[in-house]
């Protein structure tokens, strides 16, 4: 294959702007998928991806296309995830390309995630051209959207392709533009092997399959390869391309995109962004830009039925095979029993994993409120990182606590700006800028503490804006904050599963809210129950569940007052004794409802 005839490209789009449908049309037009195999969203392999209309893992497919100039080209489509939690994966997938199609819905215009990914593409020096999709819709306004793209992103749109992936309009024009506008890859097959690993997944028969873009050199069956980040070596068992099913080839040359199977046992060994080279003839330096992905959001997962603990453990291990950015450790809670503390890249990642556990493995789970990673500076000069309230040391041992801040850009129609500003202020945000992108769309940029965002920010954002807002965020830094641990106590006993780390100013309101909610949920007992919210030793809110009372005087008709008093005293004694020995069982529904309040 002549390197001048290869084009590597990806499609950049916001969720629901028609990326997967467009990919389907390209597959059909080039005859890669016959109409018999055709199904919607061919590249989205997981049911969950199809259903939620999002791409979670990167996929690649090779298209053979004879252009109008009579030459045969190989087009490698690298399908990238479009969601904010997977930014690092996107940046690596984009590095494997030379160009990109920016797909924008002609009726909706530019959204926050689109922007984030376009900037990633431009940073990677990709040649980006614009495709306006869904032009068949009555609401489509191509001229307005073109002006918006030029204004916001600064891309030239005078020759943007007008298309409708659903109707198949403009598919040929897009393919011609790819051939004309996107440069061929640069690379030298004679140099030592240097390849970028941009995705990997686990296959139960063949071990880990890695997707690579060969930068220099050649790789073939039987070669001994080495991963540069951990220096592990493997022998290549198969190498090939997806067209769109796996097809083994003689070799993969510079400029090509394909897969390698090399008997790698764990996905954790095949890290996205790593450089693959040959053991006996290594390249001199690894590719730039590799970094370890660290979980940002943590949550406890507990099976509702404790007998499902083993199942949950096996299910988590299986998911971990395919997703090295996800982490889990066993933990126990007095209230919820045995479970796991899981780490995720962000909120969407957390939702996806939870949903996959429930759907693919039939587990019923309780999840505790999500938390972030805090840095605790001790009075003795030590620094520890914690993920849950139960790990926070006593107040007297803490010098100060730092929490992560993010830079959030929110795109929203101008009617809702007031509500968004109020929400960000309530969440302790610091305003950076407000920019009118068009007379009707506004970009609001705020610095926000991540722990305020993980609870219910996204849901509130959507409900304030009737679903029209889009959010993108990046991690900024850690900042010192006045954070305290809020404990919920029942009859003086702390319920560990309900403890949370919260800002001092909000502790009272959250405590008030939680105890009043619990008062409704805890069933009455024969003795009274005190529910308290406390910060340190100071109780800041209290509710009491009154005792049920048996009428012990019912059988005394008339009679002496001392007789009645004796019975009442006896009842009082009994209740006192009961209160000392009786413990309150919290019903499961109470937990679920309380965890909802925490949002």
Curated annotation (Swiss-Prot):
**Enzyme Commission code(s) on record:** 3.6.5.n1
Supply the enzyme class, top level. Answer: hydrolase
Catalytic activity line of the entry: GTP + H2O = GDP + phosphate + H(+)
**BP term (GO), one:** positive regulation of translation
Has UniProt tagged this entry with the keyword Hydrolase? yes
Q: Cellular component per GO?
A: plasma membrane
Keyword Protein biosynthesis among UniProt keywords: yes
Top-level lineage group: Bacteria
Gene Ontology MF terms in the entry: GTP binding; GTPase activity; ribosome binding; translation elongation factor activity
- Principal place where this protein is found? membrane
Which part of the chain is the tr-type G domain? 4-186
Record keywords = Cell inner membrane, Cell membrane, GTP-binding, Hydrolase, Membrane, Nucleotide-binding, Protein biosynthesis
Location comes to: Cell inner membrane
Where, in this chain's numbering, is GTP bound?
Answer: 16-21, 133-136
- Give the membrane topology: Peripheral membrane protein
The UniProt entry's sequence similarity note says:
Belongs to the TRAFAC class translation factor GTPase superfamily. Classic translation factor GTPase family. LepA subfamily.
In UniProt terms, what function does this protein have? Required for accurate and efficient protein synthesis under certain stress conditions. May act as a fidelity factor of the translation reaction, by catalyzing a one-codon backward translocation of tRNAs on improperly translocated ribosomes. Back-translocation proceeds from a post-translocation (POST) complex to a pre-translocation (PRE) complex, thus giving elongation factor G a second chance to translocate the tRNAs correctly. Binds to ribosomes in a GTP-dependent manner.
HAMAP family per the record?
LepA
Write the protein's name. Elongation factor 4
